[in-house]
């Protein structure tokens, strides 16, 4: 099948650039291996089943939290862990057969051995469980503690999956043999689709950039390898890319919901946090509307506008919109694994913040007491560190962002040894992958104050944050003083990636730091959702006028 990737201004073929008004595309080609789409589905099912067994070692089989339906924890954990394990297994085996065995079709061996190995492992585990228990169940306890809430959650995640699937296919789909790519994403999709096809229709081992980017590969590419492998197994490229993208983003949002439910104890906060995830705060729209009301052309401008609204540097790129998750599909998978780590290490944080000491004495004991350092679950820390480290070439920014938040958790937690072990193992696996895939240094960290703010002073940064996010970040800084110790520790930790973005530069392009701000934004929506729900509901003893004012503030 000959495909053409269509978007806006140019049309690329394999060998030349052809001017084509209104379109830009990359010709795509299929290899000789034509599998059945069922093989790709079997691959994903095997990954999920393998991940289900492996993730039990992380989440604790037989453990339950009252009132929380842990199925929404286990499903994304199974997807993330299983996909990591099986995909790395297939990649390593394929690499060996290509580089050492000089095989022309290394993915054939990688998939046969990897998928067969996963199936054998599942069969052996099933037999072992049957002999031990007399029956086989995927989970040993009921993962649906609250049946009434479960029905609402099924509806919530069903609608969420439909919406995300629609958005994924809206910007990337095949029609009449032509592969279409959306206007706001085609720039990134060009190298991404090339990387996918370098595996599905080529032999890109050792892996390098398809577009003559050098002998090594400094960019995280494993998500593209997964998509390319699914296409190799017979899935159409748009189905492969969109299915794994949808599963990753829905899985991340399931964990974000679970995290919100655990922090606040309210389902409404979890639902509203997901809503706020898609609709960010900001002052750009209000400024835009006011300017065009004054000019008298607001309606016409809104009808004709095709660009992102923004007044801060590069905001018109869509740096702060949901478009980021459509453009950078691999970010959601990395955040899925990072959020899993945060959810698990909440146990450590809650233990640390539950002590009765107050003020300086409490902080002192978190640093100098035995409980502050004594390991609570070393095995879990080792495993989570390994899985997080294996994500480095899926999405490095998500790994760094997750470690930054966990660093904040560690300050206020008991069991700091476990944090150190987890971070050390994660950094080791990241370093190991960098040594294998990268010639030279992957990053060159340096102090760079102010991010994209034109005025790099503290007042200038505050002004930038206000125009970029409205009261979102600045309001939380004030809100933290009215919280209890546990919530205050969580909120401060969620701010660590934002602080990092305004202080350090990891790559030559400072714009890349926007991902760390987006990571913080995703988690901090929990606290704004909590504030809005609390204002809307009001407190016992409030007058009708006070409750009405609270509802008005919640809407605003």
Where do the protein language model's features map onto the residues?
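Transmembrane-lumen/periplasm boundary regions of multi-pass, lipid-linked membrane glycan transferases
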Residues: 187-195, 201, 412-486
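Hydrophobic, aromatic-rich transmembrane alpha-helices
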Residues: 340-351, 401-411, 425, 467-488, ...
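Membrane-interface alpha helices of multi-pass inner-membrane proteins
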Residues: 322-327, 366-373, 380-395, 407
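Membrane-embedded, hydrophobic transmembrane alpha-helices
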Residues: 8, 12, 29-147
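Signature aromatic-anchored transmembrane alpha helix within multi-pass, membrane-resident enzymes
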Residues: 422-431, 534-556
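Active-site lumenal/periplasmic loops and adjacent helix-entry segments of GT-C-fold
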Residues: 147-151, 160-337, 356-357
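Membrane-interface helix-loop-helix junctions at transmembrane boundaries of multi-pass membrane enzymes
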Residues: 137, 145-151, 351-379, 413-421, ...
């Amino acid at each position: 099948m000959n495909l053409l990737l269509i978007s806006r201004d140019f049309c690329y073929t394999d060998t030349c650039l052809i001017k084509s008004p209104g379109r830009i595309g990359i010709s795509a080609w299929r290899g000789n291996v034509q599998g059945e789409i069922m093989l790709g589905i079997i691959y994903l099912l095997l990954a999920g089943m393998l991940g289900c067994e492996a993730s039990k070692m992380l989440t604790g089989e037989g453990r339950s939290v009252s009132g929380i339906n842990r199925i929404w924890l286990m499903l994304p954990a199974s997807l993330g862990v299983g996909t990591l394990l099986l995909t790395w297994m297939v990649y390593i085996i394929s690499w060996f057969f290509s580089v050492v065995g000089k095989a022309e079709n290394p993915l054939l061996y990688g998939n046969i051995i990897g998928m067969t190995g996963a199936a054998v492992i599942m069969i052996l585990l099933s037999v072992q469980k049957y002999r031990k228990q007399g029956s086989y169940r995927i989970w040993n306890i009921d993962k649906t503690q609250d049946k009434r809430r479960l029905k609402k959650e099924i509806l919530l995640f069903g609608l969420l999956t439909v919406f995300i699937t629609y958005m994924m296919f809206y910007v990337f789909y095949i029609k009449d043999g032509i592969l279409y790519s959306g206007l706001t994403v085609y720039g990134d999709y060009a190298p991404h689709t090339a990387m996918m096809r370098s595996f599905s229709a080529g032999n890109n081992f050792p892996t390098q950039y398809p577009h003559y980017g050098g002998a090594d590969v400094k960019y995280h590419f494993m998500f593209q390898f997964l998509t390319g492998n699914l296409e190799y197994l017979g899935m159409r490229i748009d189905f492969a890319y969109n299915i794994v993208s949808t599963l990753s983003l829905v899985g991340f949002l399931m964990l974000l919901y679970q995290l919100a439910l655990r922090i606040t104890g309210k389902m409404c906060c979890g639902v509203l946090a997901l809503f706020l995830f898609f609709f960010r705060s900001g002052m750009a729209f209000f400024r835009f509307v006011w300017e065009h009301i004054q000019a008298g052309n607001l309606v016409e401008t809104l009808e004709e506008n095709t660009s992102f609204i923004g007044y801060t540097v590069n905001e018109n790129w869509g740096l702060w919109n949901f478009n980021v998750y459509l453009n950078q599909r691999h970010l959601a998978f990395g955040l899925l694994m990072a959020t899993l780590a945060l959810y698990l290490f909440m146990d450590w944080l809650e233990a640390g913040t539950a002590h009765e000491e107050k003020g300086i004495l409490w902080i002192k004991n978190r640093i100098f007491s035995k409980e502050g350092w004594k390991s609570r679950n070393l095995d879990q820390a080792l495993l989570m560190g390994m899985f997080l480290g294996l994500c480095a070439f899926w999405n490095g920014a998500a790994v760094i962002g997750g470690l930054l938040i966990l660093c904040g958790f560690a300050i206020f937690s008991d069991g700091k040894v476990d944090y150190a072990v987890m971070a050390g193992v994660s950094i080791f696996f990241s370093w190991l992958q960098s040594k294998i895939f990268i010639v030279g240094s992957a990053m060159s960290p340096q102090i760079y104050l102010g991010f994209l703010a034109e005025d790099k002073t503290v007042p200038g940064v505050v002004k930038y944050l206000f125009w970029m996010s409205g009261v979102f970040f600045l309001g939380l800084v004030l809100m933290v003083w009215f919280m209890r110790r546990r919530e205050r520790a969580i909120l401060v930790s969620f701010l660590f990636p934002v602080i990092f973005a305004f202080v350090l530069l990891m790559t030559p392009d400072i714009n890349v730091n926007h991902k760390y701000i987006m990571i913080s934004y995703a988690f901090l929506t929990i606290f704004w959702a909590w504030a809005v729900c609390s204002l809307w509901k009001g407190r016992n003893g409030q007058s009708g006028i006070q409750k009405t004012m609270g509802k008005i503030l919640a809407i605003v």
